[in-house]
C-alpha cells in the first residue's frame, strides 16, 4: 500500500531509481556488479517458500556449504532451533512442498534462519515475523542486534513494536517517505506515527 517493499527492492536492483540514487556503503548500487550486490543482500518475505525436503536441505538453500553448527546457530538466532528439536527427526524432518506441515510462524523462522546462513551484509525482513507472537518477534530482534551487529538490518513491519528499537525508522505514507527518526523523535513530531502507535497499543499491540 505505502510502497515499503518497493523501496527495499531498489537496494537489490529489482528496480532502478528513476531519480536520485540508492547507496550501499556510500556507493550507488548501479556501480556494483549485479550478482555481487545480490549476494550481499538477503530478503525474507512474509510468505517465503519452503520446498519438499528435509529442514537441513531447506536451510542449505541459503548456503550449500553451511556446517551443522552454522545451521544450528542460525536457527537459534531465528528462534527455530527449539521447535526443530521437538520433531522426532530434528533437522532431518521432512518438509512438505510449500511448508504445508509446519505453521506459518515456524515457516517464517526457518526462512529467517536460511537467510542468516547466507551471511549477508544487508538483511531485509519484509513483514517476515507477522505470523509469530510478539514475544518471539522481540527475541528474534534481540538476537539479531546482539549477535550480528555488523549486519545492516532493515525491518518492514505493520507493528510499531517490531521497529521501535531501530536506530532509524522511516514512516511511509501514500508511496512516499513521510518522516525519518527514532521512536522517541517520531512520537514527538509525527502525527501518523503517533496515531498508529496509540491505536496499536489500545488494541494490544498486535495490529
Where does each model-flagged region fall?
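ABC-type nucleotide-binding domain
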Residues: 1-207
